């Protein structure tokens, strides 16, 4: 099941998901350091990383949505929908956390706790995304799915 959102047969969605994942995890680490040290630079770095993760998630959602809409009826549609919903929940939670952290400075623990829930939602979405690719071959060209079998036949 190859994807329509690709560049030279390489799916775009997996190329972009590394940004929100990395930035959101980094933002949580930085915010934890801020809570432990109260050094304001860590809060600032955390907010920039969280904002970058929000932007990255929106950008990754575009080809992800194209992939989802072009799946058609299949056995993986439920997994894909749950993947999409979980990541949308993560995006929503991190966006709310970012807004609260910016405008509700006196309550530093609430955005951090929300971000942990966002991390959980992102982890579930990532797990399901991995299942779509590695267990069901979504976004993998037909040749790639059978490459291991072809190599074994020629050895």
Report each predicted region and the residues it spans.
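Polytopic transmembrane helical bundles with strong interfacial aromatic enrichment
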Residues: 1-155
């Amino acid at each position: 099941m190859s994807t329509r959102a690709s560049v030279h047969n390489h799916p775009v969605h997996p190329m972009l998901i590394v940004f929100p994942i990395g930035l959101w995890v980094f933002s949580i680490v930085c915010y934890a350091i801020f809570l432990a040290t109260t050094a304001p630079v860590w809060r600032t770095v955390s907010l920039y990383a969280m904002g970058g993760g929000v932007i990255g998630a929106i950008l990754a959602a575009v080809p992800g949505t194209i992939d989802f809409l072009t799946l058609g009826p299949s056995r993986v549609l439920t997994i894909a929908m749950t993947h999409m919903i979980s990541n949308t929940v993560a995006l929503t939670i991190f966006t709310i956390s970012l807004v609260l952290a910016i405008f509700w400075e006196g309550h530093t623990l609430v955005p951090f706790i929300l971000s942990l829930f966002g991390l959980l939602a992102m982890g579930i979405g990532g797990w399901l995304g991995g299942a779509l690719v590695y267990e069901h071959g979504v976004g993998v060209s037909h040749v790639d799915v059978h490459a291991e079998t072809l190599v074994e036949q020629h050895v």
